[in-house]
Amino acid sequence: REWVILDTLHRESLHTLLEEFGCKGVSEERVEHLNRMWHRLRPWSDSVEGLERLKKRFILATLSNGNVALLVNMAKFSSLPWDTILGAEVSRSFKPMPHTYLTTASMLGLAPEECMMVAAHNSDLQVASGLGFRTSFVCRPEEYGPKQRTDLEAEDDYDLIADDFI
């Protein structure tokens, strides 16, 4: 399949779920509204303050599978202070493909070892570390909901390990 943005994949998944659960007659306008909920996610309570502190000394960029419009809207909605939005749409590849990580560093004019990947997902950090990025694990025990079974702790010797951004 040709590469598509995450909004498209979310919409396809939403249509599949609506069909699977027998939700008939949902208007395309409603589907679009539901699909754009991703654009209006609220950040963790410590994120904005922590990112603002980091921004005083470091370049803050996304390395997300989200498309640019999704991430810009999310940033505006939640006041996330990114310096730039990078990741999957820019590299036209999704994590965990190495190209996604390396393109992000390259777009910033940096070598991987000059960057720090911060994530709540061990798999993200393991790939980044293998490519030479510095890494920071931030534990988010409800990232996947109250019954989360993975990413409850750092699974490797990352450069930094924290419970929050503050």
Language-model-detected regions and their locations in the chain:
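Solvent-exposed, charged/polar functional surfaces in cytosolic regulatory/catalytic domains
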Residues: 16, 20, 53, 57, ...
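Glycine-centered short loops/turns at secondary-structure junctions
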Residues: 57-58, 132
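Surface-exposed cleft-lining segments at the edges of enzyme active sites
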Residues: 32-40
